[in-house]
């Protein structure tokens, strides 16, 4: 298992769609890009295809290669493979981080999540998500709070790891 993204942060988006990536996220992108060398721009893939999702999912090169290998293992022509190829190959954007640590988000991607002047980044293990801050608060935080409220007050989240194989 490689390095993981951790944390959350807000960043300004300029009129050209440029947004700074959290510095710690850049280190993970570098470490998870097998072709990266000091002085190079780390690569990543932004997946935007699922119309139900209100965020952009950003994959390290190692993470997307793992997904690609699993897709390739599915029977050619199967419904699952067709859907996954459309989302992860057709409706994704291979890109790089520029020399100042920014991503350029094309208008199409900004429009998909209604992103304007500010972006919210949140880690998700070997991926990270980019949200419109208000959407994250309304949708994701509300859902997380609802799920937590269903658990007993003394619940330890690490209990979810019991029986997770080697944990």
Curated annotation (Swiss-Prot):
It holds the Pfam family MraZ. It is found in: Cytoplasm, Nucleoid. It comes from the Bacteria. Its main location: cytoplasm. One of its GO terms (biological process) is negative regulation of DNA-templated transcription initiation. Residues 8-51, 92-135 form the SpoVT-AbrB domain. CDD domains: MraZ_C, MraZ_N. One of its GO terms (molecular function) is DNA-binding transcription factor activity. The keyword Ligase does not apply. One of its GO terms (cellular component) is cytoplasm. Keywords: Cytoplasm, DNA-binding, Repeat, Transcription, Transcription regulation. InterPro entries: MraZ (IPR003444), MraZ_C (IPR035644), MraZ_dom (IPR020603), MraZ_N (IPR035642), MraZ_sf (IPR038619), SpoVT-AbrB_dom (IPR007159), SpoVT-AbrB_sf (IPR037914). Forms oligomers. Belongs to the MraZ family. PANTHER family: TRANSCRIPTIONAL REGULATOR MRAZ (PTHR34701:SF1). This is Transcriptional regulator MraZ.
């Amino acid at each position: 298992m490689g390095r993981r993204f951790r944390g959350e942060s807000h960043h300004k988006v300029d009129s050209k769609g440029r947004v700074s990536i959290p510095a710690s996220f850049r280190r993970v992108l570098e470490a998870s890009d097998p072709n990266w060398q000091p002085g190079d721009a780390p690569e990543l893939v932004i997946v935007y295809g699922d119309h139900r999702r209100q965020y952009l999912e950003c994959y390290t090169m190692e993470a997307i290669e793992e997904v690609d290998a699993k897709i390739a293992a599915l029977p050619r022509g199967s419904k699952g493979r067709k859907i996954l190829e459309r989302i992860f190959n057709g409706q994704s954007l291979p890109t790089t981080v520029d020399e100042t640590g920014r991503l350029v988000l094309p208008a199409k991607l900004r429009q998909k999540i209604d992103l304007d002047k500010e972006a919210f980044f949140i880690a998700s293990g070997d991926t990270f998500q980019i949200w419109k801050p208000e959407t994250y608060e309304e949708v994701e935080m509300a859902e997380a709070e609802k799920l937590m409220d269903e658990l007993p007050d003394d619940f330890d989240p690490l209990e979810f790891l019991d029986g997770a194989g080697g944990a």
